[in-house]
Amino acid sequence: MSNVIEFYKQDFSSTLFPLNTNLILIENHLEELNKYVYEKILNSEMTEHSFLSQQKVYATKPKNHLRRTIKLDPIAEFFIYDVIYRNRTKFRGAVSEERKCFGFKFKDGEAIKLHEAYANFKSDLNSLKEEFSYYLKFDIASYFNSLYHHDVCHWFTSKQVGETDSIFFGQFCREINSGRSVDFMPHGIYPSKMIGNEFLKYIDLNHELKSSKIIRFMDDFILFDNDQNVLKKDFIKIQKLLGSKGLNINPAKTSLNSEYQEVSSTLSTVKQALMAVIPTDGLNNLVSGVEVSDQQHSEQTALALSEVQIEQLLNLLKDNQIEEEDADLILSFLKNYSDNLLIVLAEILKKFPNLIKQVYSVSLRITDKELLANVLLEHLESEHLFLEYELFWLGKLVEDCLLDVSLIGKLLMKIYELSNSYKIAQAKILEIPINNFGLKEIRLDFLKTGQSDWLAWSSAIGLRGLAVAERNYNLDYFSKASPINFLIASCVKKL
């Protein structure tokens, strides 16, 4: 990996809200972004420039729970990738063989891929289960939302980064959240994952912990020993260590292996039926932030299914008693048989909005695009309660594989209308360079108001398909509203 652009591009599709507005600027306007950030925003003598307070967004979690985070604008997103990339050597590997963490760092010049890190974690986990009689598993409740700005900044300084980078990072953390000290860390981007993983090394380094082995995948801890009392004492100690940083354990995800096995022994009828069709051992105990697709990739799972198996899996997807984790697993098994999913896709979209990214992945492989478009439009016109994350990924699905279908105008405008309360989902539609169906007029309205927000920025990016003279004329007025507007306009003009 030669530079920050490659780092950003490698991570782009894995993020929660990948907007092309940011990608286009970082790919095509890096030098200008760099100058603005380091010569103006981070120049103590130019106090009129600063990082903007960032847009709150909500990704989904199972059972209608929401994951609150922020979507960084192009300038802020460039900075966090740049500062972490330049300081990537400060992020080290495991403390020792007895205290191991996995992934979220660079190795041989490349950011370690999630599925590779998880494969190593899973390999150690399986070996240690055989070696020790007991293990205790737990994770941190709302980890990224609970991180305290000053704790993270002090930690970053302690990594012996340059004094200026330490100051710059502190300014970034403070300004993107309007000075609020918690709930500032962006979710779902690799630099944040590197920070979150490395920050917890103070637990790994604590010599008061006596468990024979401790392994950690981000904030998911597993302690191993042949003595339950050792595990319990360490568990109490770790809670106190985490408490010193305002962090708490999630009680619902805390289990001792014997308790876990007891719960696992009483499986739902759907789960039992699934296991009768496909061996699923080990594919349902995910740690935080690891999707089934990553886990399957880590285990190089590639099953050739018979027609009978495909039909059985589709019938399970239709079962009203199916749990989300089982539906997720079945979708991953059927990823190479995506055309078969069209008959159940509407039901999946309705019951499991949290699976929209998995639906996006499998839908890309569907060959009958017109039928897929009809299914999506019918869903969009239903009484379903649409969430921001769902609408965003439906917009991305339309952009990435349905631009040539006959229903493209209806799909785009319906997603845009349903996203009325969701700026980032609307921005997804506005940045698509299609100028029919009223989208051009909507964009021009945003550009003429003098506003400087996601609706205006994505509208400017969406103009890149216009004739040069008309495009540049409209961008000239937009560019005068703010420095970020000017940067975006100057980037689009040279595309």
Which residues fall in each region the model found?
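Short, polar/charged, Gly/Pro-enriched helix-capping and turn/loop motifs at alpha-helix termini
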Residues: 93-98, 214, 248-249
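Short, intrinsically disordered, mixed-charge
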Residues: 85-89, 205, 240
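Conserved catalytic core of two-metal-ion nucleotidyltransferases
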Residues: 188, 192, 245-277
